C-alpha cells in the first residue's frame, strides 16, 4: 500500500488488516476496517469511521546507542499498559522524531495496533520528504532495469507511476497537514528516549516489556527466531540483522526463519548482499507474507519451545502451541539471539544499556475528557425495529481476563480455512484461552447455537458472556465474532472492547455491551484473589456463574438474577441498542441466511433510505428505487426481514 502510493501523506486510507495503522509512519491516517466493511465499500464506495479521542505522544530526547524504533514501541506498549490509548488516535510529536527513520516510524505505527490505538500518525517532515525522494529514484532505477516500466507499478503504456509522482509529492510537502493551533487532546503521554534501553516484550504479551540486560542475566534459551512479516522485514531491518550475523552461524538447535516484507524488499536485500549473509548463516527462507506470525505454514513453535521474533504479536498460541513462549524484539536482538542460542543483544560501541525501565509521564486534559464523557453520557432513545429482540437473556459465563485477544477467541491457524463450518467454529471457539470453553458451551445447550436442531434461534435468548477490558484486541479476523455466535452467544458484556472486534460484531449480529460496574462485581465475586488474568476462584479459566442475566435493548437495563425468573441480585444501566446496530443485526440474522451475503451489501447500500423509514410506521413507504433493488436481490424478501415490507 505504501510502496504503490495508496497510503500517502495527508490522506486517510482504510484496509481490512488490523495493522493498517502502519500507514501512519508516512503521515497517512491509516486505520483498519473489517472484511464485511471492505465488501460494502466496494459495493457502495462509502465506509464509516467514528472519529476517536486523540492522544498526543511526545518522544523527547536522543536515542542512546543500540536503541531502535522497535524498542520505542515495545516500551510504549509495556509501560503505558493500562489502556491509556485504547480506541484513541495517536499523534506523535517531540524532539526525538527527526532522528527516527521512516522505517522505524513504520514499525512504531504498525504496533500502535497492539498498543490499542486506532491510528498512529507521524508528522510530514523533512525526513519523510527525503525518503520519498529516494523512493522516486528507486522507481527510476527499476524502470531502467525493466526496460521502460517499473514492474508491478507502471502500465506498459506509461513510464510514470500512477500515484508516486514528483508533482504529487511537491503538493504534499508544500501544504503539509498540521495540527490546528490550540488543538486539544484527551491526554499527553511522554517518553524520555534518553532513558530507554533495548527492550523485549513478553513472554506471550505485548504489555510486558523488560530491559534487555535483565533477560540476558536470566539466560533465556531459545529454539526459534523469526525475522518475518510486516513490522520489521523491510530492507533496513534485513540489513540490521545481516550486520549482526554476517560471518557467524545460527546456534545449533536453533531455527532462524526469514521472510521479506514484499518481493520488492527481497530483491533489494538480495542486491545488497544482506539476504545472502542471512542465508549463509543458516537462516531458513520463507515467502513474503504473515506466515509464522499468524500461526501458518512451517516453523511454528511447538510445546515447550521458546521463540523470539521481530514481529508485532506474541499472544499465547498465536505463533504455534499455546504451551510455547514467544518474545518480541528488534531485528538486531533477534539475529544476535539466533547466533547465541539465547536472548541477547549485539555488542554496540558506546552502548550502556540499563536494567531500569524508561522515564514516562502522563497528563490528563480534564476539559477534553469531560466533554467526551458528557457526549458519551447523552442517551438517545431508539425505537425497537420489527423483529429485533427487546431482551437478550440467558445464563452468564465469566472469563476473568483483560486483553482477551482474537487469537485467544479464534486461533489464527483456522483463519484462512474458508470452508470451515459454523459448527466447527463453535468447536474451536476460545481454544487458545480455555480449551474447555467449547465443552462448557455445549453443556449449556444454548438455543442460539448453530447446531440447534431447529437452527439458531434469533430471539435474544442464549448464553451471555462477560469478560474484562479491551476484549477482542488484536487482528481483524471476522471469525472471532462469528465463532462466539456459532457457539450460542448472542451478546457479550465487557469493561471495554477493541474497536475492530466491535465492528466485526456489529456486522455479524453479535451485540457488544460495555458494563464496567458488572465486570468489577464479577471480578470481586468469582476471579482468583479478586483479580482478573488468573482464572476463577475454582481454578477454571471460564466461570459458570449461578446467575441468569437480562439486557434490555431499549431501556439499557441489565438485570442480574439468581436464576431464570428468580430474585434480582442487582441492576445496572447501559446504553440502548442503537438503530444502526439493530439494522445490521436484522441484515445479518435474516437477510444473509435466506438470501446470501450479496444481499447484505444491497441491504447496506440502501441503509440511508432504511434509516429514514425505520420508524415502523405503516404509512411510511420505502423509496421505489430501493424497493426495486431490494426485491431483485431478495427473492424471499418477506422471509428475509419483515422490516422491508411493513
Label for each model-derived stretch:
Residues 1-646:
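Fe-S-dependent hydro-lyases/dehydratases of central metabolism
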Amino acid at each position: 500500500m505504501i510502496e504503490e502510493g495508496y497510503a500517502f501523506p495527508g490522506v486517510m486510507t482504510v484496509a481490512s488488516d488490523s495493522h493498517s495503522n502502519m500507514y501512519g509512519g508516512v503521515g497517512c491516517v491509516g486505520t483498519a476496517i473489517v472484511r464485511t466493511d471492505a465488501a460494502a465499500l466496494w459495493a457502495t464506495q462509502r465506509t464509516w469511521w467514528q472519529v476517536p479521542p486523540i492522544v498526543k505522544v511526545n518522544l523527547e530526547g536522543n536515542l542512546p546507542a543500540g536503541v531502535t524504533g522497535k524498542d520505542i514501541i515495545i516500551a510504549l506498549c509495556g509501560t503505558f499498559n493500562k489502556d491509556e490509548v485504547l480506541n484513541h488516535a495517536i499523534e506523535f510529536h517531540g524532539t526525538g522524531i527527526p532522528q527516527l527513520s521512516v522505517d522505524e516510524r513504520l514499525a512504531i505505527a504498525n504496533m500502535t495496533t497492539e498498543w490499542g490505538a486506532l491510528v498512529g500518525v507521524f508528522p510530514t517532515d523533512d525526513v519523510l520528504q527525503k525518503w520519498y525522494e529516494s523512493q522516486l529514484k528507486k522507481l527510476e532505477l527499476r524502470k531502467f532495469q525493466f526496460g521502460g516500466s517499473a514492474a508491478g507499478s507502471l502500465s506498459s503504456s506509461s513510464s510514470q507511476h500512477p500515484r508516486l509522482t514528483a508533482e504529487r509529492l511537491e503538493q504534499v510537502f508544500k501544504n503539509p497537514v498540521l495540527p490546528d493551533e490550540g488543538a486539544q487532546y484527551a491526554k499527553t503521554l511522554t517518553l524520555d528516549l534518553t532513558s530507554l534501553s533495548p527492550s523485549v516484550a513478553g513472554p506471550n504479551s505485548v504489555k510486558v516489556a523488560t530491559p534487555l540486560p535483565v533477560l540476558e542475566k536470566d539466560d533465556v534459551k531459545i529454539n526459534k527466531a523469526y525475522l518475518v512479516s510486516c513490522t520489521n522485514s523491510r530492507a533496513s531491518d534485513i540489513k540490521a540483522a545481516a550486520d549482526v550475523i554476517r560471518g557467524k552461524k545460527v546456534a545449533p538447535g536453533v531455527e532462524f526463519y526469514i521472510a521479506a516484507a514484499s518481493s520488492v524488499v527481497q530483491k533489494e536485500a538480495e542486491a545488497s548482499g544482506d539476504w545472502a549473509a542471512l542465508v549463509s548463516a543458516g537462516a531458513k527462507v520463507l515467502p513474503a507474507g504473515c506466515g509464522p506470525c499468524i500461526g501458518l505454514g512451517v516453523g511454528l513453535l511447538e510445546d515447550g519451545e521458546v521463540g523470539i521474533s521481530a514481529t508485532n504479536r506474541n499472544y499465547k498460541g498465536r505463533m504455534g502451541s499455546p504451551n510455547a513462549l514467544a518474545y518480541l524484539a528488534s531485528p538486531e536482538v533477534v539475529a544476535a539471539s539466533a547466533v547465541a542460542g539465547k536472548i541477547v543483544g549485539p555488542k554496540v560501541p558506546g552502548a550502556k544499556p540499563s536494567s531500569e525501565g524508561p522515564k514516562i509521564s502522563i497528563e490528563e486534559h480534564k476539559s477534553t475528557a469531560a466533554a467526551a464523557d458528557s457526549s458519551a453520557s447523552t442517551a438517545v432513545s431508539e425505537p425497537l425495529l420489527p423483529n429485533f429482540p427487546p431482551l437478550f437473556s440467558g445464563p452468564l459465563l465469566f472469563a476473568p481476563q483483560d486483553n482477551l485477544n482474537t487469537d485467544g477467541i479464534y486461533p489464527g491457524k483456522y483463519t484462512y480455512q474458508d470452508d470451515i463450518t459454523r459448527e466447527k467454529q463453535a468447536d474451536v471457539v476460545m481454544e487458545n484461552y480455555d480449551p474447555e470453553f467449547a465443552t462448557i458451551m455445549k453443556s449449556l445447550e444454548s438455543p442460539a447455537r448453530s447446531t440447534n436442531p431447529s437452527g439458531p434461534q434469533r430471539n435474544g435468548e442464549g448464553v451471555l458472556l462477560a469478560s474484562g477490558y479491551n476484549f477482542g484486541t488484536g487482528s481483524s479476523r471476522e471469525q472471532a465474532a462469528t465463532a462466539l455466535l456459532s457457539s450460542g452467544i448472542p451478546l457479550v458484556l465487557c469493561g471495554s472492547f477493541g474497536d475492530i472486534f466491535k465492528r466485526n460484531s456489529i456486522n455479524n449480529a453479535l451485540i457488544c455491551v460495555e458494563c464496567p460496574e458488572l465486570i468489577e462485581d464479577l471480578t470481586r465475586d468469582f476471579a482468583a484473589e479478586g483479580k482478573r488474568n488468573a482464572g476463577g476462584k475454582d481454578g477454571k479459566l471460564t466461570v459458570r456463574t449461578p446467575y441468569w442475566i437480562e439486557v434490555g435493548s431499549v431501556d439499557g437495563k441489565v438485570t442480574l438474577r439468581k436464576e431464570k425468573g428468580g430474585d434480582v441480585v442487582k441492576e445496572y444501566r447501559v446504553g440502548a441498542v442503537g438503530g444502526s446496530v439493530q439494522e445490521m443485526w436484522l441484515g445479518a440474522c435474516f437477510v444473509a441466511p435466506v438470501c446470501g451475503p450479496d444481499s447484505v451489501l444491497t441491504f447496506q447500500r440502501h441503509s440511508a433510505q432504511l434509516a429514514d423509514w425505520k420508524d415502523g410506521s405503516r404509512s411510511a413507504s420505502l423509496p421505489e428505487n430501493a424497493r426495486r433493488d431490494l426485491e431483485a436481490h431478495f427473492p424471499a424478501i418477506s422471509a428475509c426481514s419483515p422490516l422491508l415490507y411493513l
